[in-house]
From Swiss-Prot:
Family membership: Belongs to the cytochrome c family.
Modification sites for N6,N6,N6-trimethyllysine: K4, K83
Pfam families attached to this UniProt entry: Cytochrom_C
Protein name as it appears in the record: Cytochrome c
UniProt modified residues of type N,N-dimethylproline: P2
Post-translational modification: Binds 1 heme c group covalently per subunit.
Keyword Metal-binding on entry: yes
């Protein structure tokens, strides 16, 4: 499922992305090293990881079998409309329509690595 060609995202601001994450994603996801899964999987180390690979989380079949690697470009398309990108995903989030907000969240997610 490689993303279609699209305009590049604007530069992201990780601090703004952290605020957006806490306001829109932290209800379901944790983002700390070794953190427990919530309603959704822990997103620490997400960028560069294969989809469906966090131990102990019950992924949807669509997610577990997608073969997706979470690159910034893939995350951009996914975060815009998760259900369109990956039909069958368990993620109930409707998506982020503003490119700057997606860029900011992706910049934050890129900081979450050991």
């Amino acid at each position: 499922m490689p993303p279609k060609a699209r305009a590049p995202l604007p530069p992201g601001d990780a601090a703004r992305g952290e605020k957006l994450f806490k306001g829109r994603a932290a209800q379901c996801h944790t983002a700390n090293q070794g953190g427990a899964n919530g309603v959704g999987p822990n997103l620490y180390g997400l960028v560069g990881r294969h989809s469906g690979t966090i131990e102990g989380y019950a992924y949807s079949k669509a997610n577990a079998e997608s073969g997706v690697v979470w690159t910034p470009d893939v995350l951009d398309v996914y975060l815009e409309n998760p259900k369109k990108f990956m039909p069958g995903t368990k993620m109930s989030f409707a998506g982020m329509k503003k490119p700057q907000e997606r860029a900011d969240v992706i910049a934050y997610l890129e900081t979450l690595k050991g």
